A protein has these predicted regions:
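N-terminal transmembrane-helix/juxtamembrane module of multi-pass inner/ER membrane proteins
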Residues: 2-77, 124, 133
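Hydrophobic faces of alpha-helical transmembrane segments in multi-pass integral membrane proteins
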Residues: 28, 32, 36, 96, ...
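Aromatic-anchored segments of alpha-helical transmembrane domains
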Residues: 34-39, 102-111, 175-186
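Membrane-interface loops
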Residues: 41-57, 86-169, 216-217, 221-225
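Membrane-interfacial alpha-helical segments at the cytosolic side of multi-pass membrane proteins
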Residues: 76-83, 151-173, 199-209
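Interfacial helix-loop-helix junctions of multi-pass membrane proteins
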Residues: 123, 141-146, 179-206
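C-terminal membrane module of polytopic membrane proteins
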Residues: 187, 197-229
Length: 229
């Protein structure tokens, strides 16, 4: 597999013959995430060992429930990735990067379960965004704060969505990533150190997925160049 020079595009429909593969890759990544995420949570409930991060040294920011909209916008970004990647192989690499992120994070969740920032005192607050905040918060589990899987998966998504894209588009996508990362802290889902951990996990996941993508490209190139009898 080699990437042929294509006219610049931001989003486009996948090639007709590859659309099912795109959807399968996305569904597999989702199922892998749900399986690992809730399995790690179940294991954490078997013991009381927890790592507590001290709330000082700039580890948290003031609470702003309106940022819930930005927090959940990651799902829009992931859906749009199916329109942004350049090929079926690149879509597979994106899916693999998500799975690598989840796999690495799950090991850490099991071995070093880290508690999220406390939110009990937020129950006293009211406002137009609080209902949405609590609905979103109920989907999260405990003892999996470090690293931030939300940050890791968003960075993988943005990276694969911006390959050979216009500069303005890449800047907007990375600004979107920063906004999502910021939202995890102001919504008291994570500490700043969790965000940094998520970035490291994403970097490793992208590196591993790219290595497999390049290896597949070399193999296919050799097959194409093989002389016919």
């Amino acid at each position: 597999m080699t990437f042929q020079k294509q006219p610049p595009f931001v989003w486009r429909k996948p090639p007709k013959g590859d659309r099912i593969s795109y959807v399968k890759y996305a569904i597999f990544a989702l199922i892998f995430f749900l399986t690992c995420y809730y399995s790690a949570y179940s294991i954490a409930q078997l013991h009381n060992y927890r790592i507590i991060i001290p709330e000082h040294g700039g580890q948290y920011l003031p609470f702003h429930p309106a940022w819930t909209l930005v927090y959940i916008s990651i799902y829009i970004a992931q859906a749009l990735t199916l329109l942004a990647v350049r090929s079926k192989e690149e879509c597979l690499a994106w899916s693999q990067s998500l799975c690598y992120s989840v796999g690495m994070a799950t090991v850490i969740f099991v071995l070093f379960p880290t508690e999220q920032p406390p939110v009990e005192h937020l129950k006293e607050l009211s406002g137009q965004w609080m209902d949405l905040y609590w609905v979103t918060a109920t989907t999260s589990t405990k003892a999996n704060a470090f690293p931030s899987l939300h940050v890791a998966s968003m960075l993988c998504t943005v990276w694969y969505s911006t390959q050979e894209k216009p500069r303005w588009f890449s800047l907007l996508m990375y600004a979107w990533f920063l906004a999502v990362a910021y939202s995890t802290v102001v919504l008291r889902e994570h500490y700043l150190v969790d965000v940094l951990g998520g970035i490291v996990v994403a970097w490793l996941a992208i590196m591993f997925s790219q290595k497999k993508l390049r290896g597949k490209s070399v193999d296919n190139s050799c097959t194409l160049k093989k002389p016919q009898p």
